[in-house]
C-alpha cells in the first residue's frame, strides 16, 4: 500500500491495472486505497497460474467483487469467468458481472478448444467480439496479463 501511495503522490496515475491478488485481506486493502480514484481501472482476476498453481482461494475470489465494483473493465479468462459466477455460458456470466458490479467484462477466449478463438467485450448496452486463429506456440506464460495491460 505504501507503494501505491508513493506512486500516486510522486508521479500521479493515469490508469490502474490490478493483477494477481494473493488474499482477501490484500484485495480489500487495495480496494480501500483505490476507492475514489478517478482513473480507468483494469482488473485481471488471476486465479490460477499458467503452471496450474492455485493463486486465489474462495475468500479472495469473493473479495474480487469489491475490485470489480471499482473497475472500468475486468478481464477474466473462461475458467475465471465460470469461477466468478458459477455459470457455464460465458456471455451470460459476463452479463451477470456487468449487472452486479457495473464494470465492463472482456472475456478472454484463449482457453477455448480448437483453432478458432473469440474474445468479447460485454458492456451494459453493447457487446463487441473478435475472432482469430490460435497461434501455435509454447510461449503462453503471461498472455492474460499482457492483454490486460
Roles of regions detected by a PLM:
Residues 83, 138-149:
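Short, small-residue alpha-helix embedded
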Residues 13-18, 42-49, 75-83, 108, ...:
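Short beta-strands and strand-loop turn motifs
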Residues 3, 25-30, 60-64, 90-94, ...:
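General structural feature for long, well-ordered alpha-helical segments within catalytic domains
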Residues 1-50:
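Conserved N-terminal subdomain of the carbohydrate kinase-like
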Residues 127-143:
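Short pre-catalytic strand/loop immediately N-terminal to key active-site residues, enriched for Gly-Thr
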Amino acid at each position: 500500500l505504501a507503494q501505491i501511495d508513493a506512486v500516486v503522490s510522486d508521479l500521479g496515475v493515469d490508469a490502474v491495472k490490478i493483477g494477481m491478488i494473493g488474499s482477501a485481506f490484500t484485495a480489500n486493502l487495495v480496494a480501500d486505497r483505490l476507492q475514489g480514484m478517478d482513473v480507468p481501472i483494469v482488473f485481471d482476476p488471476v486465479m490460477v497460474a499458467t503452471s496450474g498453481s492455485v493463486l486465489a482461494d474462495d475468500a479472495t475470489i469473493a473479495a474480487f467483487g469489491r475490485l470489480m465494483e471499482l473497475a472500468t473493465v475486468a478481464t477474466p479468462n473462461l475458467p475465471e469467468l465460470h469461477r466468478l459466477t458459477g455459470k457455464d455460458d460465458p456471455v451470460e456470466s459476463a452479463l451477470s458481472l456487468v449487472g452486479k458490479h457495473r464494470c465492463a467484462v472482456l472475456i478472454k477466449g484463449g482457453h477455448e478448444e480448437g483453432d478458432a478463438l473469440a474474445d468479447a467485450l460485454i458492456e451494459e448496452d453493447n457487446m463487441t467480439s473478435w475472432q482469430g486463429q490460435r497461434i501455435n506456440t509454447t510461449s503462453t506464460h503471461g498472455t492474460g496479463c499482457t492483454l490486460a495491460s
